[in-house]
């Protein structure tokens, strides 16, 4: 069952292995999530599972969403995500999805929004080298040439320039789960994941392990 789970990034810490080596890890509070909808090939054209996560206030949920969530017995859910599956065996509307569906040593893909840094210049956004800082130079943090004059007479699309930095959806693939704490709904994942502490994360079984597709992956 290749269903993922939604969670919240708590921050980073250290995990010590059996040999005493310090490993940087990310702590993720994952679930419990509620199955809010089951889609079938006969009705929807494909099989999928929709889950909900996160508490919210009732006045922030509109009537269509409230009617949709009432079917699963849970109304106050803030985030919804859908996962395509091959079959719906063993899945029930309103059932809980917890970190118990993962295990230590498993590879996962973690998606989230990167930290937004606002409007940033060339050096911070793209890592450009700065100009000479000596007296007489007029190019300290300028980008330099952005293109020729008459030909082509324009700036090519995709030219790296100053602009909004961060706040993009990114996926870190092939991360290893080092520990699963079912009592605290906690996943300890090796390495870093996108987003700042408190950011919403989508954790799902890895599609690829090494250079080969994972079992059940597409």
Swiss-Prot record:
Sequence segments annotated as region (Disordered): 126-170
Family stated for the protein in its record: Belongs to the universal ribosomal protein uL3 family.
Keywords attached to this entry: Ribonucleoprotein, Ribosomal protein, RNA-binding, rRNA-binding
GO cellular component: cytosolic large ribosomal subunit
Pfam hit, one: Ribosomal_L3
UniProt name for this protein: Large ribosomal subunit protein uL3
Biological processes annotated in GO: translation
Signal peptide extent: none
Quaternary structure and partners: Part of the 50S ribosomal subunit. Forms a cluster with proteins L14 and L19.
Function: One of the primary rRNA binding proteins, it binds directly near the 3'-end of the 23S rRNA, where it nucleates assembly of the 50S subunit.
Keyword Ribonucleoprotein: yes
Gene3D superfamilies hit by this protein: 3.30.160.810, Translation factors
Disulfide bridge partners, by residue number: none
Record GO terms (molecular function): rRNA binding; structural constituent of ribosome
């Amino acid at each position: 069952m290749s269903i993922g789970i939604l969670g919240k990034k708590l921050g980073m810490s250290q995990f010590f292995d059996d040999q005493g080596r310090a490993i940087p890890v990310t702590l993720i509070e994952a679930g419990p999530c509620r199955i809010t909808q089951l889609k079938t090939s006969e009705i929807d054209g494909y099989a999928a599972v929709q889950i909900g996560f996160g508490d919210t206030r009732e006045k922030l949920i509109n009537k269509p969403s409230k009617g949709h969530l009432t079917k699963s017995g849970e109304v106050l859910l803030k985030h919804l995500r859908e996962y395509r599956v091959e079959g719906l065996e063993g899945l029930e509307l309103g059932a809980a999805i917890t970190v118990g569906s993962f295990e230590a040593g498993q590879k996962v893909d973690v998606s989230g929004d990167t930290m937004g840094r606002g409007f940033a210049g060339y050096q911070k956004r793209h890592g450009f080298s700065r100009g000479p800082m000596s007296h007489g130079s007029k190019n300290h943090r300028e980008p330099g040439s952005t293109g020729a004059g008459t030909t082509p007479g324009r700036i090519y699309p995709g030219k790296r320039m100053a602009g909004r930095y961060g706040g993009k959806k990114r996926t870190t693939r092939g991360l290893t789960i080092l520990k699963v704490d079912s009592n605290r709904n906690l996943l300890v994942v090796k390495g870093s994941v996108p987003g700042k502490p408190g950011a919403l994360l989508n954790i799902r079984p890895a599609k690829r392990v090494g250079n080969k597709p994972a079992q059940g992956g597409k």
